[in-house]
Amino acid sequence: MNELTNFANPVAKPETFDQIQIGIASPERIRSWSFGEIKKPETINYRTFKPERDGLFCARIFGPIKDYECLCGKYKRMKYKGIVCEKCGVEVTVSKVRRERMGHIELAAPVAHIWFLKSLPSRIGLLLDMQLKQLERVLYFESYIVIEPGLTPLEKYQLLNEDELLEAQDEYGEDAFSAGIGAEAVRRMLEELDLEGEKEDLLKELAETKSELKPKKIIKRLKVVESFLESGNRPEWMILEVIPVIPPDLRPLVPLDGGRFATSDLNDLYRRVINRNNRLKRLMELRAPDIIVRNEKRMLQESVDALFDNGRRGRTITGANKRPLKSLSDMLKGKQGRFRQNLLGKRVDYSGRSVIVTGPELKLHQCGLPKKMALELFKPFIYARLDAKGLSMTLKQAKKWVEKERKEVWDILDEVIREHPVLLNRAPTLHRLGIQAFEPVLIEGKAIQLHPLVCSAFNADFDGDQMAVHVPLSLEAQLEARVLMMSTNNILSPANGKPIIVPSQDMVLGLYYLSMLKEGEPGEGSLIADMQEVHQALAAKAVTLHTKIISRVPQTDEDGNQYMKRVETTPGRMLLGETLPKSHKVPFETVNRLLTKKEIGDVIDIVYRHTGQKETVLFADAIMALGFRHAFQAGISFGKDDMIIPEAKEKEVEETRLLVKDFEQQYQDGLITQQEKYNKVIDAWSRCGDRVAAEMMKEISAVKKGADGREKPINAIYMMAHSGARGSAAQIKQLAGMRGLMAKPSGEIIETPIISNFKEGLTVLEYFNSTHGARKGLADTALKTANSGYLTRRLVDVSQDCVVVEVDCGTDRALDMKAIVQGGATIASLGERILGRTAAEDIVDSKTNEVLIAEGTLLDEAMVAAVEAIGIQSVKIRSPLVCESKGGVCAACYGRDLARGTPVNIGEAVGVIAAQSIGEPGTQLTMRTFHIGGAAQLNEQSNLESVADGSIEYRELRTITDPRGRRVSLSRSGEVAIIDSEGRERATHRLPYGAHLLLDDGAAVAKGDRIAEWDPFTMPVITETGGIVKYQDLIDNQTLTEQTDEATGISQKVVIEYRATSRKEDLRPRLTLLDDSSGETARYMLAPGAMLSVEDGQEVKAGEVLARVSRESAKTRDITGGLPRVAELFEARKPKENAIIAKVSGRVEFGKDYKAKRKIIIRPDDGSDAVEYLVPKSKVIDVQEGDYVKRGDNLIGGSPDPHDILEVLGIEPLAEYLVSEIQEVYRLQGVKINDKHIETIVRQMLQKVEITDGGDTTLLPGEQVDREEMDEINAKADAEGRTIAQGKPVLLGITKASLQTRSFISAASFQETTRVLTDASVQGKVDTLNGLKENVIVGRLIPAGTGAGMSRLRVTASSRDAALRAAQRNWQESLIAPQTAAEEHAAELRQPVQADTGDDPLGAVVGESHGTDADAGDYLTEE
């Protein structure tokens, strides 16, 4: 019966595996890999080039050098396969085994593995609870360590130097205690560790400890101890006795001409180890003095360190040319390492590259392929076809024919290429549209022809760009290329769902020209019957393209019947109308207007949405041809006279000069500060530039009429800019207006502007000034490319395993979407934001109470229009952020696939798409941080106007009426809402402290009415009661100073910052109000910089202003913009000047000051513990004593720290904050990215939870685990009736999140390879290969896209096999040793029916169907 237990499936291929585990190799394991011990450092004999025996390239150990041939030549050829030659000891087999057979070196003394020693935190150090410094002293033979103190007073693990050791031995006797040195000692210590006991001690200590920092350290140690216990690794394996030697073909030695050799650095490192090891053996045999042996051991340790990780410790070992040698770790690390160079990015065959030229006569799905290239790329196909047709007898002859390029070959090439798509790729491939499939068209010449419309997707131009061609070989690959990657299938951009196949440059110019309408052209007002007559009239020059005419255009009604419709239009627009697809959804009106680039994009969008892909492709090709033809026929060009310098320029410049002189004088007189003068000058000049530019645009765009009443041709430069073909208003401003202000390399603006424009020419000084900015621009561009690429790489890495896994996860969480409104202007409408998302609740029309859109509907354009029409303010939608799917997201939460306009398919790699969509425009973002002066900051809002008609409603607003009868807001979290006539809330606004309210609660407002106004630059301190003011701690020249305004001569009292000299002094400047009986009624703390508005002892009434604090915004501040800001947000870094957020709602009190900080205390209403904050005194505090703050309110201005938002307000507000901040940066550059991409990345940043309470699980408080992992552990605990663990979500930056994915292969290939692998091996991690990256690395089909179904089937099948095998094992175990006949009989009965089918449990599996999900039974539903 026992042979049955060997049921390793004999037919299973080694490639079929489901997971990969990494661990620490034991010495036995290393020996079992090895084919022999390497005893000599020799490599090959330099005369015969034969490997030396027992050396690093030994043929006996590693295998033969030539296929099926032993070293001495006794056995040659296949027939001796498997024989071991008795003379040279070499097995006769293929030489390929030299790539897989390993050797080993038996070390004379153990050495520590540097990864486990030096990779922080040091694993050996944590286990032994020793410092790395002390460990190193022991390992590198500097001091002894007490291993077993015995009965002596020495402590365990105490370090002793030589003298101390001798003293101790004299005192207590040699055998009373045991001490050791070097790796042997550390090894003994690791062997004697009782991990179980250690774990119990640590858990006990953790429960008892009171200190703050102790638990962290204990948890670190606990995790290491636990990982050793769980993984089955033994601690002593971190000390090596045997070193594996990698196969010789992976560290080749190649003879160069001239008798020298090129060798891999590893050979040098191995030789070093072997030499020292052999010397050490000899010294030990000779019984050399201890000190010499010890030195040799230390050197052995160092050489092994260098082999594993050169440069990690001590000096780097260098080769002959002073270059550091590449160790095993360096082979894996970095861009040139194994992971990124060979596993993630490979070079492929069947590819070629060439320069691209434009191919305007191609169709959208075609590309021109040079015949020469095609012949080379499709060679095997041609050989096969020649053979199949019987034209060539042998392969050799076929090759000859192809080389001679006989005419039969060209005919066959045509057949081969027909319907065989090829892939074109342009580097850098920033998003998935950088590789697209086309059908090749054979062309003469040597350049690839590219269709002009796909240029924007590839970001290609024809100034010498090159592109690569790849041939998809297998039928499946061709199918995918045609169905998924064909350029005609990629009309919409995956980033924002807008068409990316949009005419540009010449085409736009031609279409703009075609659709222009001019007054007074010949034949104006004629009636022309139809298109044919229009063509005739144009040919006869009776009308021009721009004449206003009345004509009839054919239209299609809903049933598809044609009818003629009368319209007023121009012949040019009718030509355009001809190209429109025939559909009632796309009427002639869509093109009956002046078409700029943006409008043409909209037209293509409409055509795509209403008539589908095929029509769109035809339409795109048609308008491309039309655009090119008319741009060519119009002959638009411009000369220098088209750059019109406005008359008003000189006047404007003169006025500004006078103004600037005035500011200069004020500064000289000391009325304004240097900074203020600078801001005012910059402001004056930038306004001047803008006014000149406006004048110039007015003149350029003016329509002039000739003597005959015809309009003169419009200005060509204006035409190019306005149509969006080329150039922009800013560029024209530099040509014909004034060049304006320039920046220094530091980013500051130079005060003297460049007044000339390029037409006038710059003076020498101006030219010199402008060189700064020009050079910085070039330097920035270079930096930007690298930074943007790195950002994309981090984004892809964090999101690569986010795939659509199911149709609907059924979550009941949702996001609330509102329109984004800033300063009264709608930046993103509600419709834009909810388009293509799934509604998470029924959308109800509040007037009729009918359900417009049911929950779970994917909102399309028509529904969105309906929602906007009834004026709904906010809609609850599903989002990847709230999705509860395991191992990915669900289709309902994700919504529409933007590149297709349909619901997203299962298996779509939405994570990678999100990363590419955010990373690809990265190069368009700026690099700089903006320095904004006071003047430019004047756009700070200072009043509030109603956005709609309705009534207003104040919320949480305390007001007081001041002596002048105005109502003043006293709360910091007050809001005003505008309610329209149907009772719907149209907008809500925060009202700042001290705002004047112009309307009563519930008052009616019209659109544009003012509701409130306030001073944006100062924040008042307002008294709530009347009384007499008393100064407290306001002492002249200590905390108070008088400043006199020189322009007006009025002096003001200003509070200044005071540093306490002695400990007892604690000056806290404040105003107190006394009532009639001198009782204190209120106190007001004053921040440094507050200007007092009342005198000591003055009587005040309620609502008066006691003091004013100037707000930060009036000063200059740096705004981080562009790429650095996006990176800062995705990395979840703490901002420089971060705001402090109230963690609880409650009343504010000020505690006792602490050195240079003030203490703010918030007492919650529910009587729970107060929360304290320490704030630097220099900061302006936004709250006063006694104020009521809500949770999440700012106590101090600035940008909030995302971690705080998550902790205080939760996931949804955090996501909203991140999305809006990131969108803000892209919006400034005019880049559109759909919100869902950013949400997908934020979801990946929020995967981890920090355990707050471990319950009865293995989780420890304070450790971070995946939310999915915690759920799994909790489900298990719950089933067993133990208490479950609790956790709170934590936000990780993208780099951190990628390094902490559950897959160690993915993390190792990203960054910090050594650290990740060390970690993983200690824990004995298992990589289940769920993400895309891991699968690419192990060389499997990725589990996304078309691979998703395959991976699903594989999982199903393997689970079914496992179940069968388990059943088989059960009855085997009962059969192995039956004690009595009765037992044997029972066992026989238990045996399943299929037992007769032989050993292989899979033999009985009947393929009843194609393995659908249903066959898998519970397996798939369990997940």
Swiss-Prot record:
Cofactor-binding details, from the entry: Binds 1 Mg(2+) ion per subunit. Binds 2 Zn(2+) ions per subunit.
GO molecular function, one term: magnesium ion binding
GO biological process assignments: DNA-templated transcription
SMART domains (alphabetical): RPOLA_N
EC numbers on record: 2.7.7.6
Catalytic activities: RNA(n) + a ribonucleoside 5'-triphosphate = RNA(n+1) + diphosphate
Pfam families recorded: RNA_pol_Rpb1_1 (PF04997), RNA_pol_Rpb1_2 (PF00623), RNA_pol_Rpb1_3 (PF04983), RNA_pol_Rpb1_4 (PF05000), RNA_pol_Rpb1_5 (PF04998)
Cellular compartments per GO CC: DNA-directed RNA polymerase complex
Enzyme class, first EC level, given as a word: transferase
Chain intervals for the UniProt region annotation (Disordered): 1383-1423
Cystine pairings recorded for this chain: none
Binding sites annotated in the UniProt record for Mg(2+): D461, D463, D465
UniProt cofactor(s): Mg(2+); Zn(2+)
Binding site residues for Zn(2+) 2: C809, C883, C890, C893
Residue numbers binding Zn(2+) 1: C70, C72, C85, C88
Keywords, in A-Z order: DNA-directed RNA polymerase, Magnesium, Metal-binding, Nucleotidyltransferase, Transcription, Transferase, Zinc
Annotated function: DNA-dependent RNA polymerase catalyzes the transcription of DNA into RNA using the four ribonucleoside triphosphates as substrates.
Record-stated family: Belongs to the RNA polymerase beta' chain family.
Assembly mode: The RNAP catalytic core consists of 2 alpha, 1 beta, 1 beta' and 1 omega subunit. When a sigma factor is associated with the core the holoenzyme is formed, which can initiate transcription.
PANTHER family per UniProt: DNA-DIRECTED RNA POLYMERASE, DNA-DIRECTED RNA POLYMERASE SUBUNIT BETA
Name the record gives this protein: DNA-directed RNA polymerase subunit beta'
Organism this protein belongs to: Rhizorhabdus wittichii (strain DSM 6014 / CCUG 31198 / JCM 15750 / NBRC 105917 / EY 4224 / RW1) (Sphingomonas wittichii)
